[in-house]
């Protein structure tokens, strides 16, 4: 499995509740915060739903 680093680049203020909950599930609570995750189909779906709020890099 490949690892990726997910960084929150935009605030969650004013976004849909579902997007805030997705960010929280990814472990992102503040702008600039980073988390390392293993790639999976479930994770890919979560990343696609909040792609306008995050940046994804290979680890």
UniProtKB/Swiss-Prot annotation:
Cysteine pairs forming cystine bridges in this chain are none
Xref: InterPro entries: Ribo_uL30_ferredoxin-like_sf, Ribosomal_uL30_bac-type, Ribosomal_uL30_CS, Ribosomal_uL30_ferredoxin-like
Return the GO cellular component terms, semicolon-separated: cytosolic large ribosomal subunit
User: What keywords are annotated for this sequence in UniProt?
Assistant: Ribonucleoprotein, Ribosomal protein
Name one molecular function that GO assigns to this entry: structural constituent of ribosome
> In its UniProt record, which GO terms are filed under biological process?
translation
Q: Does the keyword Ribonucleoprotein apply?
A: yes
Output the HAMAP family linked to this UniProt entry: Ribosomal_uL30_B
Subunit structure, as described in the record:
Part of the 50S ribosomal subunit.
Q: Which family does it belong to?
A: Belongs to the universal ribosomal protein uL30 family.
Q: What is this protein called?
A: Large ribosomal subunit protein uL30
Protein's gene = rpmD
């Amino acid at each position: 499995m490949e690892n990726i680093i997910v960084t929150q680049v935009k605030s969650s203020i004013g976004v849909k509740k579902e997007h805030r909950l997705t960010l929280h599930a990814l472990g992102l609570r503040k702008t600039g915060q980073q988390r390392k995750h293993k790639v999976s189909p479930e994770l890919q779906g979560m990343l696609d739903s909040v792609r306008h709020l995050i940046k994804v890099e290979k680890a």
